Swiss-Prot record:
GO terms for cellular component: cytosol. Pathway: Protein modification; protein ubiquitination. CDD domains: UBCc_UBE2G1 (cd23795). GO terms for molecular function: ATP binding; ubiquitin conjugating enzyme activity; ubiquitin-protein transferase activity. This is Ubiquitin-conjugating enzyme E2 13. The gene is UBC13.
Length: 166
């Protein structure tokens, strides 16, 4: 299968292997499926997630790059912008167009110029600075705002658990 999506994903994977980017690594879940990647995100320095190794699956649609991939953490992670099932909720992973809920500008949403690298750097940035205005995990957002010590304890447990799994 030599679709535009396949060729683009093969190129991005090759580029990441040749020129690794600080903060994450990526590879295929199964060598026969270019549309499903396994990524490891290293907790960013000077954040609550520092020292953690968080695993996620990045799934690309057949019409990539016209539609965004989905990213789902398979490691436990406590964060306002990660749904309880692990799905990442950031603007650039939302389909192009206007936001029906009015939280995001069209310019903040997915565009075909985004790459695996830009997505991963956005997720690392999300770990560094949670957005509690439109949370995916309401309980985590509430703790982030009102009970920061509890939030820190839960994140510390996730970091420790990720280190044990590494």
């Amino acid at each position: 299968m030599n679709s535009q999506a396949c060729l683009l994903l093969q190129k991005q994977l090759k580029d990441l292997c040749k020129h690794p980017v600080d903060g994450f690594s990526a590879g295929l879940v199964d060598e026969k499926n270019i549309f499903e990647w396994s990524v490891t995100i290293i907790g960013p320095p000077d954040t609550l997630y520092e020292g953690g190794f968080f695993y996620a699956i990045m799934s690309f649609p057949q019409n990539y790059p016209n539609s965004p991939p989905t990213v789902r953490f398979t490691s436990d992670i406590w964060h306002p912008n990660v749904y309880p099932d692990g799905r990442v909720c950031i603007s650039i992973l939302h389909p192009p167009g206007d936001d029906p809920s009015g939280y995001e500008l069209a310019s903040e949403r997915w565009t075909p110029v985004h790459t695996v690298e830009s997505i991963m750097l956005s997720i690392i940035s999300m770990l560094s600075g949670p957005n509690d205005e439109s949370p995916a995990n309401v309980e985590a957002a509430k703790e982030w705002r009102e009970k920061r010590d509890e939030f820190k304890k839960k994140v510390s447990r996730c970091v420790r658990k990720s280190q044990e799994m590494f």
